[in-house]
UniProtKB/Swiss-Prot annotation:
GO BP: killing of cells of another organism
A GO term for molecular function: calcium ion binding
PTM statement from Swiss-Prot or TrEMBL: Palmitoylated by ApxIIC. The toxin only becomes active when modified.
NCBIfam families: RTX_toxin
Descriptive protein name: RTX-II toxin determinant A
Domain remarks: The Gly-rich region is probably involved in binding calcium, which is required for target cell-binding or cytolytic activity. The three transmembrane domains are believed to be involved in pore formation by the cytotoxin.
Transmembrane regions: 233-256, 266-323, 361-406
Ranges: Hemolysin-type calcium-binding repeats: 718-735, 736-753, 754-771, 772-789, 792-809
Length: 956
């Protein structure tokens, strides 16, 4: 089929009128006789619309006439068959039998074969409106078609008395009616044909738009349209319609890449005020001319009413909305330039799609806005008359038909552009043998590396690790999702992609094959390295392991959903080697949302386990939100619960038979935590709606759940910010209470117990224990063996109870001479310069009982044998007792200074005191409640050398 152009459309429409006039002239004498006979017939039935079915055209033969008949009955349109009605087609007078509409002796006839053939001949009309054989199956399309034509002819019949017209034989009025009928036929045929030539339509619009874009300023736009060839007074109605179609090109002005958003908005307003204004002038003049011909008023007030009504019908907001679409296209195009350099042109495809569909939308918006303005003018003109103006044929009915066809055509145009996107993607995938959307994620990751490279290459220094492994989950990308939806390839997209990058000595390893990351099977292997230290950092939340599959399903007529199916793996297995590694699992998504309440809170979730085999080396593991199984292997390994709100710990190792084995129970209470949820991405391509299910991490409020971790070969546990409970084993345990009010019981063994922040209760139990209360008012018990207590400024008021052994109390950051010693009741209070007290309970109880009870024998040693300052200086329990007694229950500053000076002059003890000073200093710098990290770091300061320092303390 030949392409439709603006000029050919005008020519065709003009020819329609010309044919009408020629036929009228050619009729000659026949016209006089025919019109007289027809006039008599029309007296009884001129105001009927008839669906005419000729003899032999049977609806049972597989055509769509049966559906048209049903629709006609629904709409009250009479149905006649030739053999029943004996209709006399006025072939000799009007020769309209090859058109959809025609005059007959009983009224206006809608020819069923011609309408049926039109639908068959135009398959794209058939696809949108419904084919001739299935038209009734799609929301009553036959009703829509017949109803639209009936509306047009209803306007004709209300504005023209055909009986009177034919009887009076007024050639001017007859020409007008005939022109209207011909125009309707031509418009239906030509616009229907344009659906098959979408590219031609767009091409002609684009050509005219390119001319307009070269005009300086916007003021010349109306002149350009005014310079179109004049079709003459008799065809002014055609000029209006042609102006509407050509005026659609003004939408391209809004797409000018050189124009600012403000200029585009101004272009919309300018177009509304000037271009449509000129069309309105033509409409108004035509309406007024017809009012004069009908003997109706054409005074100034009437003209003003028409003009004002037309103006109100024009909404610049329509053009502002179009401008926003072009703005979106411009933003995406600008965004796309970077990713094109990285091997992905999907964003450019998306920008082109929005620009092309925006142009289509702009054209339709322009036409519809102009039609609304004209219809408003017609309504104003008709308001003052009892009989509507004949221009209703050219406006009210025709505009409705144009609008309907354009709306149906717009979707076909959108899909045509979408098909081009689809073909480009398929072509690329065949050439590169790779998923196109995966390439999109790859480009996003490369851009992320470029943006953050300076930060990433500094991680070796910041994290004090020779090797840093950065694992990044590229999340769902809305623009990639839009592209998949537009191209109808939603089953080919994934929820994202995970990447591994390694950094050594401040250099990025472009592809580190030594790290294995297998998302489908849940494997992370970092064991293949010759570096001594490494840090594994999950930069963004890593989704749960498993393989995704998608299925695109049609939900409604124009609605599709792509369902997500996941073959899940219930755990990650992480393998480390000989390096001393720090691994933070708090950014690994371990909970999968299963059920929600009405407020969207998670009330049921599923667990994804982490199994970590750490191998040799001194490793640090930060535990995440759910079940974790850790085998520390060789070396001194620490497990941290200090990050995230993942529940208070309950550890009971009293029955453990293997050193370093612990069962850690956690109740993660009502709060927010990372969960994997299924979200839906929605994209509209005109009337087509696409929904895509995808996975994402969601920091969602949830109800509580219980987790049990299993630890093996773990030497040290750092608690949570909640109120933890620790019960040690028969072996040496190292516990850090972290924040919260913690209860820590070392049980047997030589334990290291750190209270952290909060008012903790610490009991060393049996063994030579190292006890640090931390900040808060702590209650500390050492037991009967040789214990070491540590206090520093800011730790608060601690209460210590001891019962035997050779014990030591170290003030890690205070000189001994700056402390105050007092006897309060039977206890000893030691006060620092900040006023914080360490109270040693019942220090003097045995002495007080001995002085008051005859023959009393001491049964328990409740004293601490040495109290040590930050420089290693110390005072013994015997010296404390003597000086307290001499100082009337308090040691004077002078007496305390003398003790310190005497100790410092002792040469044979200097080496030991220096070693002990290191012990105290290291303890002072070790803050168990700290997170030991910067915003992304995982560095944990080395804890004190437990065995060596205790030996030094004992030797001291």
């Amino acid at each position: 089929m030949s392409k439709i152009t603006l000029s050919s459309l005008k020519s065709s429409l003009q020819q329609g009128l010309k044919n009408g006039k020629n036929k009228l002239n050619q009729a000659g004498t026949t016209l006089k006789n025919g019109l007289t006979q027809t006039g008599h017939s029309l007296q009884n039935g001129a105001k009927k619309l008839i669906l005419y079915i000729p003899q032999g055209y049977d609806s049972g033969q597989g055509n769509g006439v049966q559906d048209l008949v049903k629709a006609a009955n629904d709409l009250g349109i009479e149905v006649w068959r030739e053999e029943r009605s004996n209709l006399d087609i006025a072939k000799t007078s009007f020769d309209t039998t090859q058109k959809i509409l025609g005059f007959t002796d009983r009224g206006i006839v809608l020819f069923a074969p011609q309408l049926d053939n039109l639908l068959k001949k135009n398959p794209k009309i058939g696809n949108t409106l419904g084919s001739a054989s299935s038209i009734s199956q799609n929301i009553g399309k036959a009703n829509t078609v017949l109803g639209g034509i009936q509306s047009i002819l209803g306007s004709v019949l209300s504005g023209v008395n055909l009986n009177e017209l034919l009887q009076n034989k007024d050639p001017n009025q007859l020409e007008l009616a005939k022109a209207g009928l011909e125009l309707t036929n031509e418009l239906v045929g030509n616009i229907a044909s344009s659906v098959q030539t979408v590219d031609a339509f767009a091409e002609q619009i684009s050509k005219l738009g390119s001319h307009l874009q070269n005009v300086k300023g916007l003021g010349g736009l109306s002149n350009k349209l005014q310079n179109l060839p004049d079709l003459g007074k008799a065809s002014l109605g055609l000029d209006i319609i042609s102006g509407l179609l050509s005026g659609a090109s003004a939408g391209l002005i809004l797409a000018d890449k050189e124009a600012s958003t403000e200029k585009k908005a101004a272009a919309g307003v300018e177009f509304a005020n000037q271009i449509i204004g000129n069309v309105t002038k033509a409409v108004s003049s035509y309406i007024l001319a017809q009012r004069v011909a009908s003997g109706l008023s054409s005074t100034g007030p009437v003209a003003a009413l028409i003009a004002s009504t037309v103006a109100l019908a024009v909404s610049p907001l329509s053009f502002l909305n179009v401008a926003d679409k072009f703005k979106q296209a411009d933003l995406i195009k600008s965004y796309s330039e970077r990713f094109q350099k990285l091997g992905y042109d999907g964003d450019r495809l998306l920008a082109d799609f929005h620009r092309e569909t925006g142009t289509i939308d702009a054209s339709v918006t322009t036409i519809n806005t102009a039609l609304a303005a004209i219809s408003g003018g017609v309504g104003a003109a008709s308001a003052g008359s009892l009989v509507g103006a004949p221009v209703a044929l050219l406006v009210a009915g025709v505009t409705g038909l144009i609008t309907t066809i354009l709306e149906y055509s717009k979707q076909a145009m959108f899909e045509h552009v979408a098909n081009k996107v689809h073909d480009r993607i398929v072509e690329w995938e065949k050439k590169h043998n790779k998923n196109y959307f995966e390439q999109g994620y790859d480009s996003r990751h490369l851009a992320d590396l470029q943006d953050n490279m300076k930060f990433l290459i500094n991680l070796n220094k910041e994290l004090q690790a020779e090797r840093v492994v950065a694992i990044t989950q590229q999340r769902w990308d809305n623009q990639i999702g839009d592209l998949a939806a537009i191209s109808r390839r939603t089953d080919k997209i994934s929820s994202g992609k995970a990447y591994v990058d390694a950094f050594e000595e401040g250099q990025h390893q472009s592809y580190d094959s030594s790290v294995q990351l297998d998302n489908k099977n849940g494997i992370i292997n970092i064991s293949n390295t010759n570096r001594k230290t490494q840090s594994v950092l999950f930069r963004t939340p890593l989704l749960t392991p498993g393989e995704e599959n998608r299925e695109r399903i049609q939900e409604g007529k124009n609605s599709y959903i792509t369902k997500l199916h996941i073959q899940r793996v219930d755990s990650w297995t992480v393998t480390d080697g000989d390096a001393s590694s720090s691994v933070d699992f708090t950014n690994v998504v371990q909970r999968i949302a299963v059920k929600f309440d009405d407020a969207g809170n998670i009330i049921e979730s599923k667990d994804t386990k982490i199994i970590a085999n750490l191998g040799a080396g001194n490793d640090n593991v930060f535990v995440g939100s759910s079940t974790t199984v850790i085998d520390g292997g060789d070396g001194h390994d620490r497990v941290h619960y200090s990050r995230g709100e993942y529940g208070a710990l309950v550890i009971d190792a009293t029955a453990e038979t293997e050193k370093g084995s612990y069962s850690v129970k956690r109740y993660v209470g009502d709060s927010k935590a990372l969960h994997e949820t299924i979200a839906t991405h929605q994209t509209n391509v005109g009337n087509r709606e696409e929904k895509i299910e995808y996975r994402r991490e969601d920091d969602r409020f949830h109800t509580g759940y219980t987790v049990t971790d299993s630890l093996k070969s773990v030497e040290e546990i750092i608690g949570s910010q909640f109120n933890d409970i620790f019960k040690g084993s028969q072996f040496d345990d190292v516990f850090h209470g972290g924040n919260g009010v913690d209860t820590i019981d070392g049980n047997d063994g030589d334990d290291h117990l750190f209270g952290g922040a909060g008012d903790d209760v610490i009991d060393g139990g049996n063994g030579n224990n190292f006890l640090v209360g931390g900040t808060g008012n702590d209650i500390i018990s050492g037991g009967k063996d040789n214990d070491i207590y540590v206090h520093k400024t800011g730790d608060g008021n601690d209460s210590i109870t001891d019962s035997g052994g050779q014990d030591k109390l170290a003030f890690s950051d205070v000189n001994l001479k700056d402390l105050t010693f007092k006897k309060v009741d039977s206890s000893l209070e030691i006060i620092n310069q900040k006023g914080e007290k360490v109270r040693i309970g019942n220090w003097f109880l045995e002495d007080d009982l001995a002085s008051t009870v005859a023959n009393y024998k001491a049964t328990n040693d409740r004293k601490i044998e040495e109290i040590i300052g930050k420089g290693g200086e110390r005072i013994t329990s015997e010296q404390v007792d003597k000086l307290i007694k001499e100082g009337n229950n308090q040691i004077s500053a002078e007496a305390l200074s003398k003790v310190v000076n005497d100790y410092n002059t002792s040469k044979d003890r200097q080496n030991v005191s220096n070693s002990l000073a290191k012990l105290i200093s290291s303890v002072g710098s070790f803050t168990s409640s700290s997170d030991f990290r910067n915003n992304l770091g995982t560095y944990v300061p080395s804890s004190i050398d437990v065995s060596n320092n205790i030996q030094l303390a004992r030797a001291a």
